[in-house]
């Protein structure tokens, strides 16, 4: 009986793919060695301990319909599009060894004619006249009896978009999260014009089989049919939830300030697990009462644009004379935290 398992996802949904990964990892026998191949459409994937408001340009992501996905491993933020091929290697302990999976990926690249080396913070790089260029980044997760190594290979990623979404707005965040290390990157198409996702998957698969001396048929995982994986529906619901993707952010503080025709406003927020634990409002407005009331309304709210906007709008009935000011304030707050 083979100890290998090969899974290939035909979904581009990051929440679906990460839920599949999590379910397989939790329920796999300790004797099994798994390779999961997948890719995501337009997504910023952040590490388990990262703050999305600090790492990402969340406003531009929303405007461009780019999803946010928090993974269960550590490390930094990355942008995925269909120009990336994602891989996950899983194994039980004591056999789990990230150097083995790194060797497999390097062997796959070598078979395609790309000589790469492992470097620094879990990267694979190629040497160019301009210096080392990163073609792959990885992250890892271990539990008591198993571990996984997952990462991406840059095939034909839109590197300009990567810079757009991973360069955060200059918000005044005093955050305790982990800031990603920006690296010089290169696409494999610069080295192998015309290389495809399917060719890379085939190369990684063959290197996986060669290392273990076994072969196995691929299992195609599709969202058109709910995967036969224990607790998949619950895992997908969690992976796609605001509470997981945003609410798991480390505690941080945010200062917003703006000058309106009717006065200046300064908002101070303390946020924990995506919820405002303290809100202070300062203003030189001649009618400060609605803003003073707003501070109380905001405490306990989720740090979401729509929620903050609703909290501000809810004061209109109480302060109808300041309707215009409150609507202006609501629109500004919603835009500022996106």
From Swiss-Prot:
UniProt keyword annotation of ATP-binding present: yes
GO cellular component: cytosol
Domain of life, per lineage: Bacteria
Binding site for (R)-lipoate: 134
EC number from the UniProt entry: 6.3.1.20
Involved pathway(s): Protein modification; protein lipoylation via exogenous pathway; protein N(6)-(lipoyl)lysine from lipoate: step 1/2; Protein modification; protein lipoylation via exogenous pathway; protein N(6)-(lipoyl)lysine from lipoate: step 2/2
UniProt GO BP: protein modification process
Keyword Nucleotide-binding attributed: yes
Keywords linked to the UniProt accession: ATP-binding, Cytoplasm, Ligase, Nucleotide-binding
MF (Gene Ontology): ATP binding; lipoate-protein ligase activity; lipoyltransferase activity
Subunit relationships: Monomer.
Function, as annotated: Catalyzes both the ATP-dependent activation of exogenously supplied lipoate to lipoyl-AMP and the transfer of the activated lipoyl onto the lipoyl domains of lipoate-dependent enzymes.
Other remarks on this protein: In the transfer reaction, the free carboxyl group of lipoic acid is attached via an amide linkage to the epsilon-amino group of a specific lysine residue of lipoyl domains of lipoate-dependent enzymes.
Protein name stated in the entry: Lipoate-protein ligase A
Species annotation: Salmonella paratyphi C (strain RKS4594)
């Amino acid at each position: 009986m083979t100890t290998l398992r090969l899974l290939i996802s035909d979904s581009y949904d990051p929440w679906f793919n990460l839920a599949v990964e999590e379910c397989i990892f939790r329920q796999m026998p300790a004797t099994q060695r798994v390779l999961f191949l997948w890719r995501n459409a337009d997504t910023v994937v952040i590490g388990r301990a990262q703050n999305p408001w600090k790492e990402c340009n969340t406003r531009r992501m929303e405007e461009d319909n780019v999803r946010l996905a928090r993974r269960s491993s550590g490390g930094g933020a990355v942008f995925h599009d269909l120009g990336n091929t994602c891989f996950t290697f899983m194994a039980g302990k004591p056999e789990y060894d990230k150097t083995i999976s790194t060797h497999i990926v390097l062997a796959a690249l070598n078979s395609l004619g790309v000589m790469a080396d492992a470097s620094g913070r879990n990267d694979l790089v190629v040497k160019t006249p301009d210096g080392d260029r990163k073609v792959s980044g990885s992250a890892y997760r271990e539990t008591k009896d198993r571990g996984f190594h997952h990462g991406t290979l840059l095939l034909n990623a839109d590197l300009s978009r990567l810079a757009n979404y991973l360069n955060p707005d200059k918000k005044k965040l005093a955050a305790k999260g982990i800031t990603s290390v920006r690296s010089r990157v290169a696409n494999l198409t610069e080295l192998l014009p015309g290389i495809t996702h399917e060719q890379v998957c085939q190369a990684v698969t063959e290197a996986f089989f060669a290392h273990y001396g076994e072969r196995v048929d691929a299992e195609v995982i599709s969202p058109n049919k709910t995967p036969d994986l224990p607790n998949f529906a619950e895992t997908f619901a969690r992976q796609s939830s605001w509470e997981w993707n945003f609410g798991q952010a480390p505690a941080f503080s945010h200062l917003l300030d703006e000058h309106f025709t009717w006065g200046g406003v300064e908002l101070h927020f303390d946020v924990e697990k995506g919820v405002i634990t303290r809100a202070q409002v300062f203003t030189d407005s001649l009618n400060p009462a609605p803003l003073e009331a707003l501070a109380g309304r905001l405490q306990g709210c989720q740090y979401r644009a729509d929620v903050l906007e609703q909290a501000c709008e809810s004061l209109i009935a109480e302060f109808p004379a300041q309707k215009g000011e409150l609507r202006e304030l609501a629109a500004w707050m919603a835009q500022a935290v996106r």
